[in-house]
Each structure stands twice: as structure tokens, then as C-alpha cells.
Amino acid sequence: METFFTSESVSEGHPDKLCDQISDAVLDACLSQDPHSCVACETFASTSLILIGGEISTRAHINLTQIARDVAADIGYVSADVGLDAASMAVLDMTHHQSPDIAQGVHGAGLKEFAGSQGAGDQGIMFGFACRETPEFMPAPLMCAHAVVRYAATLRHERRVPWLRPDAKSQVTVQYEGHRPVRISAVVFSQQHDPSPSYETIRETLIEEIVRPALAPTGLLDENTRFFINPTGRFVIGGPFGDTGLTGRKIIVDTYGGMGRHGGGSFSGKDASKVDRSAAYMARYIAKNIVAADLAERCEVQLAYAIGVPYPVSLRIETFGTARASESHITHAVKEIFDLTPAGIVRTLDLCAPRYRSTAVYGHFGREQFPWERTDCVCDLQRAVRPFALSGQIKE
């Protein structure tokens, strides 16, 4: 049966992504001096204004104003004409320390039964997802959408298309036969630009020099693919001048483009004690290893935690009818192989390292440089599950 699925992405200059990057740059600055920093940093961006709030408890000495200016300048916000001037924008610091009530649960000073163990930083549910649609074990529509805005940013930074500005959004619709992507049926691409080029020039350039080269490796474009390029006809006003930005408003872009479920918690600006982030990374790690181990074609992992408790209150594995062993046996293997305590997740995925700003654009998943994208548990999973395999051999 033919079906369609659509996902979107946004550029590094999108106002919400500007905020995500500032929040994660603050986190990195803290972790680089104090790996045990407790950070929950939120950023708000509006016309000529960056406001940084949240809770930060750290021994690090950081300059929030300079961090915000550096991030904005790196993106390309160096003039009010393009949406923000990093040098002249106002930066307000409204941060304060983490609540001691939360801290005692995180650091093992809460209820006696959990004494001495790192507890989850909050309650919540987290999901991880993996599938065989792409080499990255990610949904094809989202990876295509990321590819368009990432390639546009590369051309902009290299000045190969000199009239490009930082703000942009993409959206890609993929046609499926079953769970197999067969073609791209539509591409929506809105790219901020200087006022000088004509719409005809903009449309032709964006299609021929950005969209087609970015998506050509997929082999999914065809003569019937429809292109919707800057559909309003003009996109000169962008960035925080055009739209307010806020940390954590692009959680679907950050994860699976809507194909996998989301627990609701955002990632950027949060240290690894916040299971919204760390457990979502672990859930992806588990799901990807299950699919890479050929135990299922598609897999979704749900974890749930209670604040201050040093282990998950639930684990659920969903394989959408594609498993080569029972889900109960896969779940048992996961419990045996993966350390799902907050402290264990941090150790396994090296989450005290200051690498978070690079996660804040083009998705937290499907990018091989991150530890949660490793497939180093494949053999362990295969050994644990092979005796219980259903019809069809589990590949080595």
C-alpha cells in the first residue's frame, strides 16, 4: 500500500535553534570546567534581545553574554539587516541556582532507600526509535529535511550563494510502499535571502544548487517531485526580527520527525542528570542496536523515571510486528545488557563531555560522531536473543 510521511527541519539560524545552540553552548562551557555541573539553561530571543534564564549550579566561571554573542556571530547574525547583530544585541542573565530539593534527589541524599545513588533529575517518559530506512537507522523524511538545510548552510558559510541569510526551514514528503521509501513526492524549502535577487533567481538557485544536490544521494527525487520554494514569494525578514525564538521548541526536529513518539521533554541546555535528555539518548542507543542486530526492522524503546529514583520505573520495547524474537525476550536481554540507571547512562554514553552545542542543529540522532549512535552491543544482543529466535535466522 502506498502511503506518505512528511518531516521538517530548520537551519542553525532559525530563532528556536539559535536559542538551543546558546543553551547548549552555556552547558558546554560549564562542563568544560566542571564536569559535574547541574545546568538547565533556557534562552529567549526577540528583536535585538537575548534573555538567558534557568538554573545553573557549577564551579565554572563563564561569561554568558560572550557565549551568546559568539554563538550568534558564528551562525552569521552580524547585522540587524539579517535579523540580529551579535555585537550590539542586549543579553540579559536571569539564571539562578538549582533547587536544593531537586539536588538532594539527584545526588543521592533523598529518601533512605535510595541513599548514595544518583537519582533521576525529574519524572518523565522518554522514547528512542530506529528503523532500516536509511544507513543511519533513521526515518528517511527527517534525514532528507536535515540534508537540505545543512547543505544550504554550507553554501552560505562558503559564500557560494552570497545572498543567502541564516534563517531557513525545509519539509520533505516521502512516498512509501509498506515501510520502504520509494520516492520524494514534495519538498518545501523556505530560505531567508537578501532583497536583491528576483524570485525566479531564488527559486532556480535553491532547487538546482541546494535541494537537488542535497537530496541526490538518496536516489528518491524523480521527474514528478514537486518543489515549493519560498511559497510566500519573499523571505527577507528573518531570525529574531521575524519570529521569537525559545529553547526546546523544535523537539520533533531534534528527534525522529514525528515518526517515533516523543515523551515531551526537550534536550538543549540540560546536563545529563536530566533524564529528559540522557534517557532519550539511551533509548535511541538501545533501539539502534536492536535494529542493527537484526532483531527487528523497526524498534521503539520507552523508558520512564521517577525523580530521585536511581532506576527506571518501566521499560517497553515495541517492534511493530517486525521482531525476529519475542519482545519479552528482547526486553529481558536489554535489561541484562544495558545499565539504565542515570549514573550508568552517563558512564556508558560519556555524557559529561562538553559536546552538546553540536547536537543542537540537524538532529540529535543519526549522526555518527555521538556515542549514543554506536552499535557496539549488537553481538551481546544477538547472543542473548538467538536461542529464542522466531522464524527467520538472526544474522551474524
From Swiss-Prot:
Residues 98-108 are annotated as: Flexible loop. It is found in: Cytoplasm. Pfam families: S-AdoMet_synt_C, S-AdoMet_synt_M, S-AdoMet_synt_N. Its main location: cytoplasm. Its EC number is 2.5.1.6. Keywords: ATP-binding, Cytoplasm, Magnesium, Metal-binding, Nucleotide-binding, One-carbon metabolism, Potassium, Transferase. K(+) binds at residue 42. Mg(2+) binds at residue 16. PROSITE patterns: ADOMET_SYNTHASE_1 (PS00376), ADOMET_SYNTHASE_2 (PS00377). It is an enzyme of class 2 (transferase). Its cofactor is Mg(2+); K(+). Binds 2 divalent ions per subunit. Transmembrane segments: none annotated. It catalyses: L-methionine + ATP + H2O = S-adenosyl-L-methionine + phosphate + diphosphate. Pathway: Amino-acid biosynthesis; S-adenosyl-L-methionine biosynthesis; S-adenosyl-L-methionine from L-methionine: step 1/1. ATP binds at residues 14, 167-169, 234-235, 243, 249-250, 266, 270. It comes from the Bacteria. Homotetramer; dimer of dimers. Catalyzes the formation of S-adenosylmethionine (AdoMet) from methionine and ATP. The overall synthetic reaction is composed of two sequential steps, AdoMet formation and the subsequent tripolyphosphate hydrolysis which occurs prior to release of AdoMet from the enzyme. This is S-adenosylmethionine synthase. It comes from Treponema pallidum (strain Nichols).
